[in-house]
Swiss-Prot record:
Its main location: cytoplasm. PANTHER family: LEUCINE--TRNA LIGASE, MITOCHONDRIAL, LEUCYL-TRNA SYNTHETASE. This is Leucine--tRNA ligase. InterPro entries: aa-tRNA-synth_I_CS, aa-tRNA-synth_Ia, Leu-tRNA-ligase, Leu_tRNA-synth_edit, M/V/L/I-tRNA-synth_anticd-bd, Methionyl/Leucyl_tRNA_Synth, Rossmann-like_a/b/a_fold, tRNAsynth_Ia_anticodon-bd. It is an enzyme of class 6 (ligase). It comes from Chelativorans sp. (strain BNC1). The keyword ATP-binding applies. A motif ('HIGH' region) lies at residues 43-53. A motif ('KMSKS' region) lies at residues 629-633. It comes from the Bacteria. GO terms for biological process: leucyl-tRNA aminoacylation.
Amino acid sequence: MATERYNPRTSEPRWQKAWEEARLFETKNDDGRPTYYVLEMFPYPSGRIHIGHTRNYTMGDVVARYKRAKGYNVLHPMGWDAFGMPAENAAIQNKIHPKEWTYDNIATMRSQLKMMGLSLDWAREFATCDVDYYHRQQMLFIDFYKKGLVRRKTSKVNWDPVEQTVLANEQVIDGRGWRSGALVEQRELAQWFFKITDYAEDLLSAIDGLDDWPEKVRLMQRNWIGRSEGLSIRWALAEDTAPAGVGELEVYTTRPDTIFGASFLAVAPDHPLARKAAEGNPALATFIEECRHMGTSVAALETAEKKGFDTGIRVKHPFDAEWTLPVYVANFVLMEYGTGAIFGCPSGDQRDFDFANKYGLPVIPVVMPEGADAATFEITAEPYVDDGVMLNSRFLDGMSNKEAFEEVASRLEKETLDGKPVAKRKVNFRLRDWGVSRQRYWGCPIPMIHCDTCGVVPVPKEELPVKLPDDVDFDRPGNPLDRHPTWRHVKCPQCGADARRETDTMDTFVDSSWYFARFTSPHADSPVEKDVVNRWLPVDQYIGGIEHAILHLLYSRFFTRAMRDTGHLDLAEPFKGLFTQGMVVHETYRAEDGRWLTPAEVRIEGSAGERRAFEIATGKEVAIGPLEKMSKSKKNTVSPEDITESFGADTARWFMLSDSPPERDVEWTDDGAAGAHRFVQRAWRLITEAAPAIGDITPKAARDGDAAAISKPAHKALKAVGEDIERLAFNRAIARIHELVNDLQGPFAGLDKADEETRAAAREATEILIHLIAPFMPHLAEECWAAIGGKDLVAASRWPDFDPELVLDNLIVLPVQINGKKRGDLTIAREADQAAVEKAVLELDFVQKALNGAPPRKVIVVSQRIVNVVA
């Protein structure tokens, strides 16, 4: 029987309206069912949703719809990470206020997301630039400040002298500002910091308990926190080379065992000793100034050419006062790590090795592989960086490097310099306190006041929020808040004198470090309602990109602890389960003149082996580039609206999850989308053509007979798809749904002439199929449900239960041994008893041949496992 094609253009808006009118996805905090919180990392409102967003949010939506059907009270909210530089850039370029630009974009993207049929609780929506949100963020800031978790100190920043602003490390390109092109300077500015280092040990040790996080993310966090055990060693300066008033240099090292391989010491350009040495050395002062134009990030320092300047200062070796080593100022040493000074052992470290070769410093082998000959072992082309045996190290020779570590530590702890131990054991962390000051307008104002008499004073909570002024201009470089005629001027809340508001705003990472908690009670007067947030957190399933594996997740873990310690909640970890999805990639297209073209501007010709691309407008051939992450710069983006217009949202959702495992990248192709749409139509045809025969039938599974060929694959798929969704194996779940449609195709062909038992089984199998596709293609599921006369909405119905007997395979294969050696197999009904198994085994040709007409001495049957015939 022919059926009309499924039309998503009419179907999808209709069901979206039905869900909205039923307020189906609005979550009640007082619902008594068990809770389940699923959250995708909220988007920045850049203006358009891209297909990568579609994949991310569809994954979360599948989980949310499935858990809802399983009887959970599901929280699945959406909001906007709305502060940040792009809005200010748009204000400058397009003469539009950041607020207007941001909220216009939010409106556009909200409508795009709604077209995808996501089961989101829009009643909880907020943007981080909403006054209601950043008001509560300011409350948290003050609570953290009063708890001692916030401090103000000078810090080195990237300063763009043209833009008159601080640049993030990513905005410094080859030492220049990304927009102005000006040489960036490193400046010392007073900055606000969250004391995340107070939690370093806890943040590190708790990683072991994050069982539902990817191991690669846990490893990245461990490395970022970077715990190391080492020795802080005080090196005495040679008196005849020391600047006035300086007698020693403290160095932190994780490899004190290599101390006899030291050939130089190096200090950071902003180390006090470097500044002191530069006072009478113009060349050194010039070198330090050059270093100020490098980026401040570890990555910038790692990739830059390693440069040093010999200060002329020398230090005495801790174990030999006659042995002195030069002190360099080096551009790769960080003041923020350890003591801002290192000793270089070129034979055991690649960076030190390169530096020593560049400046003609000795390379002394001090660790060699186990079994190597100390008389012949040399360091030539590269250092030896692994564990081994000590050599050229006096009293350490022959020890393992770990034994040498302990020996050096114990000896130097007993030695003294000016009455204090030469060395002490120390645990260091790579993790630095989190600088949250940004010299920009479009961010959450820091609620602090500067008074000449009282110093820094927090804004009283009853005077919050500190709102951003709307009447600002971006005609000149710098932060508009600094030059606002009235906003920054305020009375000191402590003494009443004239004072100044803090004009820095908060790093946007602050906004995203607690939004998941605010979603639990988004309209509360306090940042969170404690009993409510304790019930919902931690987030059961958090989904987002691997690019946020370190900073966002680490800052969120810190924030949850800080909120706990300031009385807002009672837990430490914000996210129980974490899933990092792959990217959506697409090939790129480039014209001869260098222009990037969108997929819509290109016509593809030829087969897979000889594909050629042509620009539609000109007819000229264009170069096909590699698969890359979709980006606006290379124009290899696909609009979800275009896909929805062509095929419908369900097709986009289905294809996004069907092509590859969710943790891997997926290649967007028009052919793939078309293939997904063909399946949509196939499933629709199967169900609607069966509808007349099953419309008024009561569903009932069949365990035997011809009807069992319908019920068994349906129940097996029901069990397997549920397990796959629980494991986030969406592509496997989709493959099983494909199989089920194939399995039902034959039995459904003659339903109009089938008996009642078969039609009852078909009705139940159809209902199962509809429920299976519902989390993935919710609009199609509702349309199919209506077509078979289903009551209410699929989105509000419970997940069916599978019949355990129907998911068992009827036949099992048992290995058959004769006298303990396998000779073959027996295929038999799973429910066969021992007598039936013995009888069937003795009828096997290879068993009869082995027995040669004699009866067996014994037949041993291990139920559903193995059979052993003892001849």
